[in-house]
Every structure is written in structure tokens, then in C-alpha cells.
Amino acid sequence: MAAKEVKFGDSARDRMVAGVNILANAVKVTLGPKGRNVVLERSFGAPTVTKDGVSVAKEIELKDKFENMGAQMVKEVASKTSDIAGDGTTTATVLAQSIVREGMKFVAAGMNPMDLKRGIDKAVIAVTEELKKLSKPCSTNKEIAQVGSISANSDADIGEIIAKSMDKVGKEGVITVEDGKSLQNELDVVEGMQFDRGYLSPYFINNPDKQVAILENPFILLFDKKISNIRDLLPVLEQVAKAGRPLLIVAEDVEGEALATLVVNNIRGILKTCSVKAPGFGDRRKAMLEDIAVLTGGQVIAEEVGLTLEKATLAELGQAARIEIGKENTIIIDGAGEGSRIEGRVKQIRAQIEEATSDYDREKLQERVAKLAGGVAVIKVGAATEVEMKEKKARVEDALHATRAAVEEGIVPGGGVALLRARANLGTLKGDNHDQDAGIKIVLRALEQPLREIVANAGDEPSVVVNRVVEGTGNFGYNAATGEYGDLVDMGVLDPTKVERIALQNAASVAGLMLTTDCMVGELAEEKPSMGGMGGMGGMGGMGGMDMGM
């Protein structure tokens, strides 16, 4: 086992904070409508230009292992916020840096880190409650467009196209983002269905960039039991191979010899296949398989209807224009099912909704209707160059996450104002002791930091703007894009409540862990032995026969 280097107390914390600052300073230049870009080196090809906080954070690895530990912990804040809320990564990073920076001053002054953390946690609970009170539902297309455009760095076109796509497929509908062929953004709405089951083996992936398996014009085999013996599958595989088209297998499970054979055939290019587990459980699984059959014009191979796997023919297989299978989701686009059959199926499910007694059953049935009737919206991102395309696509995906979060939990005034207003009751909040009160003060100071960074990136004086905004009430704030003060909701500067809440909770969680750290253990760098002297290279003395006296 390699030797370790151990740091204690202030020397450990100082190195950790240095790492936090390096990462946070790189990320926070992107905050706000006038935030700057960050250019990321790539080992091959053009560098990536981004204004996405989490993309910047993920690239940073520091040489000093103790500084790197601090940076990695803040990177976790950004990643976690991105995973849950889909946006707000830069805000979360700025909050974490501020809580750590302020908190370390109190720790250095001799306060108890555990009490500081308890005070921080109390303050965060109070602020999240206040955010919920400030929040209002996001229901109109105009509000959805405004949230989208703010998240996409004040790009109104992106906000508009997201609002349109949500209008077409519903707020719970499936929206995907693809590379476009022109300079303009385009919106395609395709009949389709998404269910939450992904590929059974990563060897089915044929698009490494997106980590998905894409099948164009495939057949779809629907089976209600497990498949483990390849002999049962061979007859239908041979028919599909002759037809020269890919195959998606949806079954209770595909395992053992059957899965191995499918993977080998796929890798060798003999037959392009992918297999996924059927969605749902028990009776719901049968119903959802039937939904897929109706949508794709196929039949579920089940013994109860007199069909067996060995005798299955192409006539029983469903078909679709395109299927995209990810790690956790499968999207069937443009199934070959008849419109009248799909309508009949939707009516049948709606009748079941009316008869359903439990909320859970009703919700699951409504999900099935949405999947059958909703379709899939595809936003095609247009750009002049590949570098611009990647940057724009990342912004569209961020904006999409933000609008979903807004629909889910509502909206609050943006521009860092909601966090400032949510401090309202922190002035009167008391901890159990003096150190906990200090923890509450840390959060009080941290909540103005996002606004300060937005203003600084816009080239204005943060303290002047913060004081002016604090004097105002409600939605009054500073619009950094135009340099004006006013009602931010009327100006269309909105943030999803969920994004603000998750950013604060994650930042406080990781910052609290850092404040309570008193020891760090890292790998000790191995000293490479020196090569030693070459020792005069004996035997070369004088090189006789050469007259040096020229």
C-alpha cells in the first residue's frame, strides 16, 4: 500500500479552500446575461466554447492533490444540481464558495464547526420555505418562453421554440434536442412514445457521442416472458436478417445465451439489434406491451393468445421509423400502427381512468394516454459551425430542463433577487447558541453573492446595486441585460423555484462538510530515484592516435 500524506487543521483547510476558489472563479465568469465564455481544450478537434457552469467544472483537475479535493467537492455541487434541476449549476457553485469562504473565517476565529453547520442548515430550511411563498405557478406560454430564454443566456428564440414544443406535446410530453441541418432552429413534432427502460447491454450502443443505440426503420418483437434460450429466437432472427432491417426486442428479460448471441451479432454487424426489458410490472406490464403493439402495428407474442416465439413471423412484429434507446429510456418514433386502433386504445384507457378508484392508478393511466397520444417533439438546433452548434445545443438542453423545473414547482423573480428576498426572516431566526447564530449569518451573506456576481460580470458596481435592490420590495430588482431597475417578472427575468432551491441545498450541504473537515489524507508523491553519475565512462581516455596539438 502506497504511503499517504496527511494534513491537519488550518493547513488542510487552506489548501482545500484554494482549490474551491480556483474552480469557483473559473465557473462564475459565466453567470448572468453578460457572463463570459470559457474555452475548453480538447485532445483532438476544435476546442469547446461554453457558458455552462457544470461543463467548466467537470473539466477542472488540479495538480495539488489537496487543492484538487476541494475543487472536486464543489464539482459535486455543480453536477448534483445539474442532475436534479438541470440548471443553476453556476449559482450553486457561487453559493458554495461564499459559504465556505465566510465559514472558514469563523472556524479560524475558534468557533465550533459543527454548530456553524447546524446554523447553516437551519437557515437553509427557513430560506427554502420563504422561496415556496415567493413562488407562483408557471402556466402561460409567455412565462415558459421567458424562463427558457433566461436559462439560454437571454436567447429569446430558444425560449420561444421550447414554449412551442411544450404547447404541441403537453408539459409532460417528450422533447428531444438534435443537430439541425440549417442555420435556424426548427421544431418537428413526431408521433412517438417513451418508456423508462434502457438497453440491457452497453454493447448495443451504436452512437458513442450520445451513448445511445439508434435503430432506423426497425422491426419490434414484443414478448411477455423471459428469453434465455437462443433457439427460441432463431427463426424470427433469420427472417429479420433476410429482410435486412434492425430489430428491437422488448421482453420481460433477455439473459444468458440469448443476450450474449444478440450482442455478438450486433458487434460483428451481422444483425443490428437491441433488447430492453418491458416497462411496468405485472398486469401493467401486459397493458403497456399492448400499448406498444397498437402504436407499432404489431402483436404481443403471448401463449394466452395462441402465439409462441418459435413460430413468430414478420407479420406479428411491430414497425417504426426510428427508435432511440438510452441507458434508462427508449423512444419509439413514428410507429406503424393504424390511427383508428390508437384512437380506440386511448378511448379504452380514458374509460378506465373514469372508473379508477385510486389516485396512483389514475396517474399511471394518464401517463399511458400521454405516451400514446402525445408524440415526441424534436428541436433541431441550427448553427453556422460545429463549435457553435455544440454550444447552442447545450444551452437549449439547459433551457429545456429549466422550463420543466418551472412547470413543476413554479417561478420566482430572477437575477439573484429571489434569494435576496428569501432572507426576509433570517434576521429574526435564532440558533441554540452564538455559534449557530454565526452559521445563520454565513447564509445571510452568501444569498447576496449570486446577484453580486451577475452585476460584476455586467461591469457594474455590486455593492451599489445590492443596496438599491435591498431597499426595494417584491419583484423589484436589477436587469443586468439592460442595466435597468424595475419589476423583474414584468421584464421577463424569471428563475424556476426548483433550480434556486436545489442550488442552495446542494451548496450548503457540501460547504457544511468542508467546514467540518479537520484532516485530509492524500497519496504521497513517489520520489523517483535519480539516475546517478555516469562515472566518467571509463576506457575512453585520450583516444590515442589523435594529435591534439593542431
Curated annotation (Swiss-Prot):
Keywords: ATP-binding, Chaperone, Cytoplasm, Isomerase, Nucleotide-binding
Signal peptide: none
Molecular functions per Gene Ontology: ATP binding; ATP-dependent protein folding chaperone; isomerase activity; unfolded protein binding
Listed GO CC annotations: cytoplasm
Major localisation: cytoplasm
This protein's record includes keyword Nucleotide-binding: yes
InterPro entries to which the protein is assigned, alphabetical: Chaperonin_Cpn60_CS, Cpn60/GroEL, Cpn60/GroEL/TCP-1, GroEL-like_apical_dom_sf, GROEL-like_equatorial_sf, TCP-1-like_intermed_sf
Catalytic activity: ATP + H2O + a folded polypeptide = ADP + phosphate + an unfolded polypeptide
Localization, UniProt: Cytoplasm
Lineage top rank: taxon: Bacteria
EC number: 5.6.1.7
Enzyme class per UniProt: isomerase
Function: Together with its co-chaperonin GroES, plays an essential role in assisting protein folding. The GroEL-GroES system forms a nano-cage that allows encapsulation of the non-native substrate proteins and provides a physical environment optimized to promote and accelerate protein folding.
NCBIfam families: GroEL, PRK00013.1, PRK12849.1, PRK12850.1, PRK12851.1
Assembly notes: Forms a cylinder of 14 subunits composed of two heptameric rings stacked back-to-back. Interacts with the co-chaperonin GroES.
Protein name in UniProt: Chaperonin GroEL
